[in-house]
């Protein structure tokens, strides 16, 4: 199969969409769940050795295939078997469009499948970091992007995408955004504070995954420079075991074990309560795009300390209140956290309102996801039915 079924387009505005990506990503689940709720037939193509955690929307189908074994050296036999298996899965699903989320591996799979039309949605590190790691990664990025029928980016990715080989006419701008009706300012949950023993303590919430990319170790080092009433909360969900163990050992060595709270699991529906519990939200990765975490924190009106990266500056550069710090700088991070923690309540409230207004104006998920949906119709040369006629 070398072509998709777009040629069979008719009056029906229900699309058949297949996705390659991490089936356990809350953001990808949000994306595919939205499309399924709009009446489209959505299928996740998942490697056989990949465990799909509970919570994938019931309206999203799962089709398994045997992916090639990614690593420093990829066996040609593995590539051939993976390509054949994915092509068979696509033949069973017969999508109008194949959308790979994340250039590395998932995008490569889309390219190797030979299926068209396919879309690559870039996430951040897959375009900012991975293509620079080896000549093979750079070559695969170029081949995948040049052959793609559309490449979805956020604005700060444009130059990196072009440098990696994406044709400019294929670039389209998207933002997942934040659900501003769900992520709102509100009172702190007394039950949540009591559950984690946080009475009388100030909370720094660091919601990114515990992996080397997100530099949670920097947050722990910064914590050692903050007053003893300050604690840091991090989610265990999707943590890399080695990195989690390293961070816990470092916290113990610094005498901070009782001030580092690793939360076992946070359901997406409960995230607003954790943001509201936070006196400050911190996000200091090495690389980032238009972080949904950042947008959710702003939508909840929380003070924010973030890495000074182009994608972050795009949203926060002109906004008074959020603190931007260099990558891998615990001292600067600690100083920024201290300033944010010491904000007077009236200043905190005013700046929180401004931050939320930015998200409501520019990243309301109801609009951003609808805009993303319209790009699929654009690619197929089809016009969706008017709202309300579905």
Spans of model-derived segments:
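N-terminal subdomain of nucleotide-sugar transferases
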Residues: 1-58, 224, 366, 384-390
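Glycosyltransferase donor-sugar binding loop
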Residues: 50, 178, 231-248
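Short alpha-helical donor nucleotide-sugar binding micro-motif in glycosyltransferases
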Residues: 90, 265-266, 273-278
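Conserved donor-binding/catalytic core segment of Leloir-type glycosyltransferases
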Residues: 151, 197-214, 220-227, 233
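Nucleotide-activated donor-binding/catalytic signature segment of Leloir-type glycosyltransferases, i.e.
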Residues: 245-265
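Aromatic "clamp/platform" in nucleotide-sugar-dependent glycosyltransferases that forms part
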Residues: 286
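Short hydrophobic beta-strand element within catalytic cores of glycosyltransferases
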Residues: 303-306, 313
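Conserved acidic donor-binding segment of nucleotide-sugar-dependent glycosyltransferases
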Residues: 318-331, 339-345
